[in-house]
């Protein structure tokens, strides 16, 4: 039951990719590009983003759109990326042998990518009821002449 002051719940869908073998910081860079964009525009941005993580985020976003279309019967053109975040997953630890019997630790980081899309009602056309600005006082040559005549 929604509490007092809660925002209205919009229809939408979500998709989660867990244990993705990408560093969470690198995935967050890509997710920040698409948060708040319309879903179709976000797909285009991800398609041409040079980062390696954009491929995984693209798949998650496409899955969220498909979930909204097939499970919730929503129009894919009216979807907006309302939430997109990356959580840290487990880190696999490996050792890299080094000289003199040493070993350096290698951290293979994973992340969980979550994308939520919501249907947005088409925006009502705004009325062009812009108030007319008061006309600026114009100084005409006749007005300036009358002022200067009295000063002589």
Swiss-Prot record:
One of its GO terms (cellular component) is cytosolic large ribosomal subunit. One of its GO terms (biological process) is translation. Residues 124-152 are annotated as: Disordered. GO terms for molecular function: rRNA binding; structural constituent of ribosome. CDD domains: Ribosomal_L22 (cd00336). This protein binds specifically to 23S rRNA; its binding is stimulated by other ribosomal proteins, e.g. L4, L17, and L20. It is important during the early stages of 50S assembly. It makes multiple contacts with different domains of the 23S rRNA in the assembled 50S subunit and ribosome. The globular domain of the protein is located near the polypeptide exit tunnel on the outside of the subunit, while an extended beta-hairpin is found that lines the wall of the exit tunnel in the center of the 70S ribosome. HAMAP family: Ribosomal_uL22_B. Part of the 50S ribosomal subunit. This is Large ribosomal subunit protein uL22. It comes from Salinispora tropica (strain ATCC BAA-916 / DSM 44818 / JCM 13857 / NBRC 105044 / CNB-440). The lineage of its organism: Bacteria, Bacillati, Actinomycetota, Actinomycetes, Micromonosporales. The gene is rplV.
